[in-house]
C-alpha cells in the first residue's frame, strides 16, 4: 500500500485529488494539508511514498 500526502491551499482541488485516489484500494491517504507548514509536519510524521503538492500556494 502506498501512503500519500496531499498539500493544496484550495479545498476544491484537494477534494478532487482525494476523490480520484479513493478509487484505488492500494493507496492510503495519510494526510491532507492546506499549507506548506502543515505539509512539512505531515511528511515528517507519515513518511509518504507519494506527495501531491500545489507548487503555487498563497
Name each region found by the language model.
Residues 47-52:
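Proline-aspartate-enriched helix->loop->beta-strand connector
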Residues 1-3:
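Non-catalytic signal-transmission and effector/linker regions of two-component phosphorelay proteins
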Residues 11-30:
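Two-component/phosphorelay signaling modules centered on CheY-like receiver
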Residues 57:
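Receiver (REC) domain active-site loop signature in two-component systems and cognate sites
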Residues 5, 30-31:
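Conserved beta-strand positions in the Rossmann-like core of class I SAM-dependent methyltransferases
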Residues 42-46:
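Conserved phosphotransfer cores of two-component systems
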Residues 32-41:
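Helix N-cap/capping motif at the beta->alpha junctions
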Residues 8, 54:
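Active-site residues of response regulator receiver
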Amino acid at each position: 500500500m502506498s501512503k500519500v500526502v496531499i498539500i493544496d491551499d484550495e479545498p476544491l482541488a484537494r477534494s478532487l485529488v482525494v476523490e480520484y485516489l479513493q478509487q484505488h484500494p492500494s493507496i492510503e491517504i495519510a494526510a491532507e494539508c492546506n499549507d506548506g507548514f502543515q505539509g512539512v509536519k505531515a511528511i515528517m510524521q507519515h513518511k509518504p511514498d507519494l506527495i501531491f503538492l500545489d507548487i503555487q500556494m498563497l
